[in-house]
């Protein structure tokens, strides 16, 4: 008997991940994510620890589902970013003031109970306290402006300016949190070649 085909969330929701190098409006359906929240400089140890915790839970849940006959590909890393206080536009704040929520998309059939069970099993193995902070969340973004950014993360401001102009041209404004979808691994790709989908809800 041939092996069952793995579910590929990016292929299943391809329209939501199309991002040319010009800003465009997209409609994003509600989606389930494994999520963990943190703050501070993304080059600091806390960020890496939470990325590791998120992937540990993601692969544990995936293997559990594979044994049950519901195999799927673990999706890539995504993140929500925002500032705090009176200046919520994070580009105006120091990196130590940034707030972020790291995300990995999961199929709709994944439940909070199995995420909790995966985290518990990892904690029993002594895999790190950050594991306990991984939760299942549903993100409801709806209408968004989306665009592909190529280059260093620190140069995203120019891409965001183009996205903001797109929103204004359609009589819309930014709302909610800045969303990044990482298509490149910064450990293996030069900064000028990094590819990141930028998304921002509008209304």
Positions of predicted regions on the chain:
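A solvent-exposed interaction/effector surface
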Residues: 1-203
